[in-house]
Amino acid sequence: MRVLFHPDFPKEVRKFESDYALVSQGLAARFRSEIDEAIKSITLSPNSAGHFLNLGSAVVRELRRRNLRAFPFFILYGVTGDRLIIGAVIASRSD
């Protein structure tokens, strides 16, 4: 399976990582490690690594989300044919 990243994905990760670095370098490193772990999990098993995107009134089966374990973020991705597309890292809440 071919893995593609949205062009903004690395910038988004670096932005959130630098925000955590303002608090603690260790926290930033843990955030980055968890992002890398989630991407590895998605790549190894894209159909079971995350769950369908639920928009409240509709479930979008073409898109999946993989929640990070220790941080309030998820990775949005999709599988189409032989391609895995990693789209975005998104904050789960805004506080």
What residues fall within each predicted segment?
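Basic, Lys/Arg-enriched alpha-helical interface segments
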Residues: 1-65, 80-83
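Enriched for short, Lys/Arg-rich terminal
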Residues: 68-95
